[in-house]
C-alpha cells in the first residue's frame, strides 16, 4: 500500500514524523540521482544537464521545507 492510500484518517504526530522522514529520504535520493544523471547527460545536451541540475537544486529546497515542517510539528 502506498502512503497516499491512507489519506482517509487523521495522522498522529508519530505518523506525520514518519511520513516526513520518508519524504526527506526520498527527495535526497532523487537529488543525488539527478546530479549523477546530469553528469552523464552533459555528453548529450549541456542545456538539458543544466536543467536537471536546477531540478536537483529545487529538490534540495523542497527537502529543506520538509525538514522545517518536521521541526514545526
Model-derived regions: residue spans:
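Short E/K-rich amphipathic alpha-helical oligomerization segments
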Residues: 28-49
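Amphipathic alpha-helical coiled-coil segments
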Residues: 59-73
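N-terminal acidic leader/helix
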Residues: 2-35
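Short, charged, amphipathic alpha-helical segments
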Residues: 49-57
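Inward-facing hydrophobic residues that define packing positions of alpha-helical scaffold repeats
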Residues: 20, 52-53, 66
Amino acid at each position: 500500500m502506498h502512503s497516499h492510500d491512507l489519506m482517509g484518517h487523521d495522522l498522529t504526530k508519530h505518523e506525520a514524523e514518519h511520513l516526513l522522514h520518508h519524504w526527506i529520504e526520498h527527495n535526497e535520493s532523487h537529488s543525488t540521482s539527478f546530479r549523477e544523471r546530469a553528469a552523464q547527460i552533459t555528453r548529450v545536451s549541456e542545456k538539458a544537464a543544466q536543467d536537471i541540475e536546477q531540478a536537483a537544486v529545487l529538490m534540495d529546497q523542497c527537502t529543506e521545507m520538509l525538514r522545517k515542517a518536521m521541526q514545526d510539528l
